[in-house]
Regions:
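C-terminal lid/capping helical subdomain adjacent to the catalytic/cofactor pocket in oxidative enzymes
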Residues: 3, 81-119
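Active-site substrate-recognition segment that forms the wall
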Residues: 1-90
Length: 119
């Protein structure tokens, strides 16, 4: 119960170390790793440890004794530039590859794709 009270109630971004934190229901979610791994959701412990240490440093009253690792697959390109073009199949367009910047870039790249469709 102490952990719930001591965890922040707003989303946080620690830009220098590339860690984000937010509430997810009654849980405290901390994320900060991404790698080009193909279709692979294996979670390496060496990627989890820095996240736990970050929580322990900035939120010492939040317990890290139990945690639930999770990995999601996000289409992304090596240079983080999304793919916004027509496929080989006429009338089918790509709008993917945004990686962790999906919500940030999606509206603008949707406009780019819409412009291509209307041409």
């Amino acid at each position: 119960e102490t952990s719930k009270i001591c965890a922040p109630s707003v989303s946080l971004i620690d830009q220098p170390v590339k860690i984000v934190a937010s509430r997810l229901g009654d849980r405290f979610r901390v994320a900060g790793t991404a790698e080009l791994a193909g279709i692979n959701t294996d979670i390496r412990q060496d990627r989890i440890k820095p996240l736990l240490k970050w929580v322990e440093k900035y939120f010492p009253n939040v317990s890290t004794e139990t945690y639930t690792p999770w990995a999601g697959l996000r289409p992304m390109t090596p240079n983080m530039m999304p793919i916004t073009r027509e496929s080989k199949m006429k009338g089918v367009f790509y709008h993917a590859g945004h990686g962790h910047l999906g919500w940030t870039l999606s509206a603008q790249t949707a406009q780019i794709v819409a412009n291509k469709i209307s041409q």
